[in-house]
Amino acid sequence: MAAPAPRAGRRWWPVGLGVAALVAWSWHGTRVELGALLSGAALAQIAAYLGRLFPPDLSAVALRNAALGAWETFAISLVGSGLACLIALPLAVGASATVLYRGVLYERRRPGPLAGLLRRALGLASKTVLAVCRTVPEIVWALIFVFVVGLGPLPGVLALGVHTGGVLGKLFAEVLDDVDRAPIEALQATGAGRLAIVLYGFLPQALPQFVSYALYRWEVNIRAAAVMGFVGAGGLGQRLYVALNLFHEHELLTLIAAVYVMVTLVDALSAWLRARLV
């Protein structure tokens, strides 16, 4: 009984060696030199810059600026996450093979050849849209929307909505494909149509996981919203960019502290909501 274990271990050796070789090759290719970072001159420069950050700027103007930026970033992340859910849900239904063209819904009555082809085409189109949305990073979407609609919070909201919509759509589709078939069969036994089965059989089972994924992505988006401000998408990131360019180090530390406080509070709020809703 114990004989297969060594063979399994031996199978992993080539994979482990290959990964190690790839990491070593990548390290060499990027020409990373930790010695330069840990040299006396570099450490002295880091210490000097950190010294210029303190003390933080606690003036009324700086605190108001940080509070407004934090509120704007919070709003961007929340509205962007809500937009993402609106984008993800219909595309997830279209991308779910179990809902659209195969599985328990179609064991008793299969769609005709033309209807089946159209359903598969719709599924492919939905998956393609989701793939495009999620493979382009948020900051690239933000740059695109800055050029389209101008500076401010709107491009940040649109960027988060599009990218996160693609991520959530893929996750939602996988959840729909893995629902328990027993409630579906019970609804079929009552003569319910496919739309009713999707609404009352699929979605109630999937909803807790939908909420969990959406809350997790909101936690990710609050960080992304802060970064997107560096390309003009509003929020704390835009204020951080200005403070860096103007060498306002004391205000910069205040803004960094605001980012930390905001992210910590959102993480705690998301965990509290997940514990009560999921």
Model-inferred region functions:
Residues 144-202, 208-217, 268:
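Membrane-cytosol interface at the C-terminal ends of specific transmembrane alpha-helices
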Residues 147, 160, 219, 224-259, ...:
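Glycine-rich helix-loop "coupling/hinge" segments at transmembrane-helix boundaries
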Residues 81-89, 93, 97, 139, ...:
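Hydrophobic positions within alpha-helical transmembrane segments of bacterial inner-membrane proteins
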Residues 89-97, 171-178, 182, 221, ...:
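Membrane-spanning helices that line or support transport/gating and their immediate boundary helices
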Residues 110-159:
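Generic hydrophobic transmembrane alpha-helix motif, especially the helices
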Residues 212-215, 253-278:
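C-terminal transmembrane helix and the adjacent membrane-cytosol boundary/short C-terminal tail
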Residues 67-75, 123-133, 215, 219, ...:
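Alpha-helical membrane-interface segments at transmembrane helix boundaries
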Residues 1-82, 86-90, 94-124:
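N-terminal, non-cleaved signal-anchor transmembrane helix
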